[in-house]
Amino acid sequence: MHAFRTHTCAELTKDAVGQTVRLSGWVHRVRDHGGVLFIDLRDHYGMTQVLCDPDSPVFSQVEKVRSEWCIRIDGTVKARDESLINPKIPTGEIEVFIRDMEVLGTAEELPLPVFGDQEYPEETRLKYRFLDLRRESLHDNIMLRSKVVQSIRKRMWDIDFTEFQTPIITASSPEGARDFLVPSRLHPGKFYALPQAPQQFKQLIMVGGFDKYFQIAPCFRDEDPRADRSPTDFYQLDLEMSFVSQQDVFDTIQPVIAGIFEEFGGGRRVDTDWPLISYRDSALWYGTDKPDLRNPIKMQIVSDHFAGSGFAIFAKLLEQEGTEIRAIPAPGGGSRKFCDRMNKFAQEQGLPGMGYIFWRDQGQGMEAAGPLAKNIGPERTEAIRQQLGLQVGDAAFFLGGKPASFEAVAGRARTVIGEELGLIDQDRFAFAWIVDFPMYEKDDEGRIDFSHNPFSMPQGGMAALEGDPLEVLGYQYDLACNGYELVSGAIRNHKLDIMYKAFEIAGYGADEVEKRFGGMVNAFKYGPPPHGGCAAGIDRIVMLLADTANIREVIMFPMNQRAEDLMMNAPSEPTGEQLRDLSLRVIPQE
């Protein structure tokens, strides 16, 4: 007999009745029923009920067992009485009578119980993550992640992609976040960086003559945490292809992503129609570049109905250049109570408020109500209703100004309206490609900077770069699903003259480009092929499949919101010897 087990805790069925078996696992819980001790014994695979009566030679030992002790038992498999069968577990038709037991590991008083789904503070869960991982929901999430990664690999191999590994220690490069720097012992005063993404390396793989590359790549970014983003590191399906157009990339990755969601989505509907929406239209209609298309609400510009109207705030606002009035339809939101609640929401988001109109049945016909309706009159309110396609019982909310001043709040309001009015289908995955991203934007100081990936090919090539930088569009694209960005990619700029010009517009001289991207600049002198690709966030994919809003629920050992590993006490202070080896000195903060 094996030293620890003949079967797992999910394996025994009625076919094993009468057999002597050996099981090992953790004590999930102990119950005393009339002097007979019942133990739910748990391992990675499942649960088996084992019991010990006073006639057992190890009864006195079993009495001492507590939750989460690790034990090995030998016993006889018996069938449960018909009335005691548990159909919820594979072993629910049998139980094992203990005849021998060995304690493999005791457990101190638990800082959080493994049994049950009671919520505990996240700090406690992260400090004792090894215990938290034993809990069924988190254990299942981590196993789901493993299966998703395995399936992704197989799907990529099946379409002739080759998996390569790229360096983890490399040079710093501007990719939208802060680098994690690594001091060099052999080169005092110089630093490596952990890669924010394998961006340059995967492009160099294409220059190296390989056709289709992928890897499940770790990425390191010193970012502020969010619920859907880890503050230090994450994993992505990274891929690149030679001799491809933007549509080729879509046609390649779409079946992979759709297949993963169909395989692991638990029966939820996976949309087959993935519309292409321009970045500007997405911002206009949804207030974000990662829209949730399960929500049917589509915002519209209604400036014409307020220009010269009796609502002076909007009328005067529209006299300023670059302003507009945008409407958020709310089907079924036609009550003053709901409208007032949404107005308060806008105020909580830092805006003065949100105007509204709602339509009600007055017996003699439809009537528009609310402060705006009184100020602009029945003809304008009726024109708004017809434009938005609203009926009795519906409402519309209005925000005005320059789009940058209210667009994000409008997007959040659209989400809240959809959630509160029950408009969002929770059993659906809705995808959309967001395309035609602007190449450049102005930073907080008014300087031109890259808005996304600096290595993207501008639409129109060199000619486009000769005009207004803020009008230049790139061959950049994102895939949004249910309000999250899942995939981001681009057709790359493989022409050195266009690359130099693109960086020059963003304030990088040729010398700096060569210094920071010397490897790629040098490679592009030797016949670089047209190429493009994308990366899909593994963490976010699994987060959606697991139906959780917190990315830490699908990462085995995540950091907390302050980028701390409470279990391993990281970050920690280096020793003096370590600092001397690296020729470093810590300057205390004042």
Swiss-Prot record:
Chief subcellular location: cytoplasm
MF GO annotations: aspartate-tRNA ligase activity; aspartate-tRNA(Asn) ligase activity; ATP binding; nucleic acid binding
GO biological process terms held by the UniProt record: aspartyl-tRNA aminoacylation
InterPro entries from the UniProt entry: Aa-tRNA-synt_II, aa-tRNA-synth_II, aa-tRNA-synth_II/BPL/LPL, Asp-tRNA-ligase_1, Asp-tRNA-ligase_1_N, Asp/Asn-tRNA-synth_IIb, GAD-like_sf, GAD_dom
Annotated signal peptide: none
Record: residues binding L-aspartate: 175, 221, 452, 492
Protein name: Aspartate--tRNA(Asp/Asn) ligase
Species whose genome carries this gene: Dinoroseobacter shibae (strain DSM 16493 / NCIMB 14021 / DFL 12)
Gene coding for it: aspS
